[in-house]
Amino acid sequence: LDSVVDTHSMFFTNAPQEELAKHLFELSDGHFARSLFFSSGSEAIEGALKLARQFHVERGEPQRVNVISRQKSYHGNTMGALSLSDASRGPLFSPYVVPARQIPAYFPYRDQQADESEDDYALRCADALEAAVLDLGAETVSAFFVETVVGSSLGVVPTPPVYLERIREICDQYGVLLVFDEVMCG
């Protein structure tokens, strides 16, 4: 990583970048065969938004234009990433951002009920995704963006496996792409 030179990866490559890509492919046990590197998390989110759009258009589903993210999230400083970040962060920029539906964040310190187990609370939060998908119309939802560990806005709150499993099920059921924003958590 100390020797990677930032180049526009659509047209150029370099040996350290290729070695890193090969290493990541090996770690994935054959699940991944391509990579695309970005200079920042914001650019990665922008790329994921574009990729989600192209994916659905190529599949003959151009009506999938809605994206969902979580309240209290931070996905970056570009306009697309700001669109996905908590809505309270950008009223100044609201004329420029893409509207995104927000569902409650997983934040047990503030939102878990006293009589609720951690798993029950996590599933309640995850089920808000299904409600949002159905409210928007499942055939119009492109992607759900989620931070697995919310860093800057909640103070390093990890998401439990039961939540992640449930959102995976929901996304698979309705044809929604699941995008993990893991830039800050490593």
Label every PLM stretch briefly.
Residues 64, 140-141, 175:
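Local beta-strand N-terminus motif with an aromatic residue
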Residues 157-186:
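Catalytic PLP-binding core of fold-type I/II PLP enzymes
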Residues 14-15, 42, 71-74, 150, ...:
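Acidic, glycine-rich active-site loops and adjacent beta-strand->loop/helix elements
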Residues 71-149, 158:
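PLP-dependent aminotransferase-class I/II
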